[in-house]
């Protein structure tokens, strides 16, 4: 349980730090620097990447994978994926409304209307892609042989989504880090819970 606890503590530290002048100044400096490196072709690439963390993309993806699990009589795992995604979305919404951090205002390339901390797309990506990787490795033998690579791919996708949020001007770096910490926290909780259920069934 040390990983979820560490991630939760990291999130709490970030939530407090974003109200300090030093962190806010650093966030703004990075966001301004991101604007300076923009290129038309990169704008399109980052806009495409950011959709990988959108709920409108991830929910159908989870439903499709969940349907496949149901077909192969892995109903519990499919339901667990939906449950963790729902928890992810609810937790993010509640925290944004509670913390009420205003988004950066440095020529954003996409429109967002909710509050900024923690980043929802980053939280989605850091939670959902590792969870998908976990269940794919669990049920597909040919992927279980390449477990490390599957998790690396999931991690790379999450990191790219986080970078895209800063590049597009809709989040500060600390928003992304906050989203990552909570997303990974949920992943480790789901993984640990599923492994305990598995051990219980084997008794």
Curated annotation (Swiss-Prot):
Q: Quick one: where's region Phosphatase sequence motif II?
A: 118-121
Q: Which residues lie on this side of the membrane: Extracellular?
A: 18-55, 100-119, 168-172
Active-site residue list: 121 (proton donors), 171 (nucleophile)
Q: Which GO terms describe its molecular function?
A: phosphatidylglycerophosphatase activity
- Indicate where this protein resides in the cell: Cell membrane
List UniProt keywords, sorted A-Z: Cell membrane, Hydrolase, Membrane, Transmembrane, Transmembrane helix
Q: Where is this site: Stabilizes the active site histidine for nucleophilic attack?
A: 175
Q: Which residues form a coiled coil?
A: none
Region Phosphatase sequence motif I: start and end of each range? Answer: 96-104
How is the protein disposed in the membrane? Answer: Multi-pass membrane protein
Known EC number: 3.1.3.27
The protein's job, in short, is: Catalyzes the dephosphorylation of phosphatidylglycerophosphate (PGP) to phosphatidylglycerol. Also has undecaprenyl pyrophosphate phosphatase activity, required for the biosynthesis of the lipid carrier undecaprenyl phosphate.
- The name on file for this protein is Phosphatidylglycerophosphatase B
Q: Which species expresses this protein natively?
A: Bacillus subtilis (strain 168)
Higher taxonomy: Bacteria, Bacillati, Bacillota, Bacilli, Bacillales
Query: Which gene codes for it?
Result: pgpB
